[in-house]
């Protein structure tokens, strides 16, 4: 399919390109696994990386990978069909994460956190299996900001996400090229291009992450007073002033 090359397309492409350049996310010879969940974010990321690849000053490969967590009703076939139709190299993996979560999860533990850890490990393994040195994930600007607030409000830590970092396995570099792209733009871009969005079919999807939903609501309220609040919060992540913080480890 040919993407609709309107002003929105150009804005997203420019912001992805800016993130890649500023943080050195892609280098010559990279083989990048893109985690494609079937959601709007990962489709946008995949198509943008492929678009930029065609005119990039460096040569890199893009490989689409998907982890089926085993939730009943998940339509992996729809994702696979879209990827093949658009000429992507595709690797799909079926797991029984759903069964593992049902068996191992404690009543007081988060369903989402266990699922995320299992899926992350599977993505790392699949990327390594197919000789990919980098794993691209579809976290966008709103995810960075919401994570910053969640960690401050509920964890007591001043942290969010990194646009690029070495994974815990010490082998795979995780990159997040959508750091400058808003969720609002991604929603519209996905609609414009009619991406076949697939629900993960998790039994608690849409109800479990109440804290993140509250952060979205809070930001929406604050935007009424300050339309630039998201840009300001994102800018704060790149403007850390250690002398004005309390962490003794930062003192020279």
Curated annotation (Swiss-Prot):
It is found in: Cytoplasm. A motif (PP-loop motif) lies at residues 37-42. SUPFAM superfamilies: Adenine nucleotide alpha hydrolases-like. It catalyses: cytidine(32) in tRNA + S-sulfanyl-L-cysteinyl-[cysteine desulfurase] + AH2 + ATP = 2-thiocytidine(32) in tRNA + L-cysteinyl-[cysteine desulfurase] + A + AMP + diphosphate + H(+). It is an enzyme of class 2 (transferase). Keywords: 4Fe-4S, ATP-binding, Cytoplasm, Iron, Iron-sulfur, Magnesium, Metal-binding, Nucleotide-binding, RNA-binding, Transferase, tRNA processing, tRNA-binding. Gene3D superfamilies: HUPs (3.40.50.620). It holds the Pfam family ATP_bind_3. Its cofactor is Mg(2+); [4Fe-4S] cluster. Its EC number is 2.8.1.-. GO terms for biological process: tRNA modification. The thiolation reaction likely consists of two steps: a first activation step by ATP to form an adenylated intermediate of the target base of tRNA, and a second nucleophilic substitution step of the sulfur (S) atom supplied by the hydrosulfide attached to the Fe-S cluster. This is tRNA-cytidine(32) 2-sulfurtransferase. It comes from Geotalea daltonii (strain DSM 22248 / JCM 15807 / FRC-32) (Geobacter daltonii).
């Amino acid at each position: 399919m040919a993407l609709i090359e309107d002003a929105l397309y150009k804005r997203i492409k420019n912001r992805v390109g800016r993130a890649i350049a500023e943080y050195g996310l892609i280098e010559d010879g990279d083989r990048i696994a893109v985690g494609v969940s079937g959601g709007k974010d990962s489709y946008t990321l995949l198509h943008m990386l492929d678009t930029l690849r065609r005119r990039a000053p460096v040569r890199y490969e893009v490989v689409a990978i998907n982890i089926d967590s085993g939730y009943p009703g998940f339509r992996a076939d729809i994702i696979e069909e879209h990827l093949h139709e658009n000429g992507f190299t595709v690797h799909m993996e079926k797991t029984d994460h759903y069964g593992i979560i049902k068996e191992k999860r404690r009543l007081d533990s988060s369903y989402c956190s266990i699922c995320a850890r299992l899926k992350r490990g599977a993505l790392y393994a699949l990327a390594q299996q197919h000789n990919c040195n980098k794993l691209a994930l579809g976290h966008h600007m709103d995810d960075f900001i919401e994570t910053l607030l969640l960690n401050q409000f509920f964890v007591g830590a001043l942290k969010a996400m990194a646009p690029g970092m070495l994974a815990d396995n010490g082998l795979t570099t995780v990159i997040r090229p959508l750091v400058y792209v808003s969720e609002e733009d991604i929603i519209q871009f996905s609609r414009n291009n009619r991406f076949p969005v697939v629900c993960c079919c998790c039994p608690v999807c849409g109800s479990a992450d109440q804290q993140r939903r509250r952060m979205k609501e809070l930001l929406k309220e604050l935007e009424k007073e300050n339309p630039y609040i998201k840009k300001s919060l994102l800018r704060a992540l790149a403007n850390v002033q250690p002398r004005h913080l309390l962490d003794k480890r930062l003192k020279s």
